[in-house]
Amino acid sequence: MANYSHAADNILQNLSPLTAFLKLTSLGFIIGVSVVGNLLISILLVKDKTLHRAPYYFLLDLCCSDILRSAICFPFVFNSVKNGSTWTYGTLTCKVIAFLGVLSCFHTAFMLFCISVTRYLAIAHHRFYTKRLTFWTCLAVICMVWTLSVAMAFPPVLDVGTYSFIREEDQCTFQHRSFRANDSLGFMLLLALILLATQLVYLKLIFFVHDRRKMKPVQFVAAVSQNWTFHGPGASGQAAANWLAGFGRGPTPPTLLGIRQNANTTGRRRLLVLDEFKMEKRISRMFYIMTFLFLTLWGPYLVACYWRVFARGPVVPGGFLTAAVWMSFAQAGINPFVCIFSNRELRRCFSTTLLYCRKSRLPREPYCVI
């Protein structure tokens, strides 16, 4: 079959056996780790009902996208390297594989942006987040992201920003030409804009958390109390909160007349809001690490693409381009490690699932906290 690389590229020499071996070994490792890791995380998210919540629906969608890219697109890259950096499947197959690869890339970028917005809502507007971000809302967001990704990846199939086999990359993807005769620059600019917007949302979230942690000088105002209810201008509200939670004794405070006291609330219930806030921060940290790694691993490849579009002189060095392409491949298998090492809840559910599969769990002995 003909090679579909553009005529402006120089004819590459055949790869040395050592280079081909390193490429095949590393790519095979990436395929195995990505498929197995994302599949295990997906099974865990589906099986454990405690993880059927808004952030983990999005994580399941990211895992499915990475499995799609690793199981379908990467084997064709593997075969092209094995065949000496040549494409032997025809033009239509090349366009389909390139479409799936670009679809997965834009889907991950769009989804990470939507996740950053939901993370900000979870911490800054938690009540709105818990009421509005239901299963159907998450499903609508996921459908919207896939629709936008298809809209971005499909036009090159119709030769708008042509898909072709790039021999230097061993894959079918965008054919990047000079910016004066280029159709792919708009797609790259949009991808860079999405990544920048995602970072700005997380930056706003960091500023929000930092502002709430600032120490302010305390101004003491005397509170009014005849029966230890402490109401009035100087009251901090803690006595009223204790009374509502079922810890108050004596008559109803004057400011809480007509409000029923909750007598069934336990002492642990008082710390639920703080625990949820810490959990949301841990989940936000996990997704930010994913976003940062996506930007880090795709950054060199984006630099190489912009280099080919705007640079007039030398071409992109072969070693840099190969490393950039393989780093973008590695991004598909990095998320499972981030999930396990940065999320305590996922790690606990994962270990619990493995213990449940191996042996029956022993009942815990009763203990008393002194």
Curated annotation (Swiss-Prot):
Disulfide bonds join C94-C172. Keywords: Cell membrane, Disulfide bond, Endoplasmic reticulum, G-protein coupled receptor, Glycoprotein, Membrane, Receptor, Transducer, Transmembrane, Transmembrane helix. GO terms for biological process: signal transduction. InterPro entries: GPCR_Orphan/Phoenixin (IPR051509), GPCR_Rhodpsn (IPR000276), GPCR_Rhodpsn_7TM (IPR017452). GO terms for cellular component: endoplasmic reticulum; plasma membrane. It is a multi-pass membrane protein. GO terms for molecular function: G protein-coupled receptor activity. The keyword Endoplasmic reticulum applies. Changing V221L: Found in a patient with autism spectrum disorder; uncertain significance; induces response to endoplasmic reticulum stress; negative regulation of dendrite morphogenesis. Highly expressed in brain and testis. Lower levels in small intestine, placenta and spleen. In brain regions, detected in all regions tested, but somewhat lower levels in the corpus callosum, medulla and spinal cord. It is found in: Cell membrane; Endoplasmic reticulum. Its main location: membrane. Changing M152T: Found in a patient with autism spectrum disorder; uncertain significance; induces response to endoplasmic reticulum stress; negative regulation of dendrite morphogenesis. It comes from the Eukaryota. Glycans are attached at N3, N83, N182. Residues 1-25, 79-96, 159-188, 308-313 are extracellular. The chain crosses the membrane at residues 26-46, 58-78, 97-117, 138-158, 189-209, 287-307, 314-334. Residues 47-57, 118-137, 210-286, 335-370 are cytoplasmic. PANTHER family: G PROTEIN-COUPLED RECEPTOR (PTHR19268), G-PROTEIN COUPLED RECEPTOR 85-RELATED (PTHR19268:SF7). Orphan receptor. Interacts with DLG4 and DLG3. Belongs to the G-protein coupled receptor 1 family. This is Probable G-protein coupled receptor 85. It comes from Homo sapiens. The gene is GPR85.
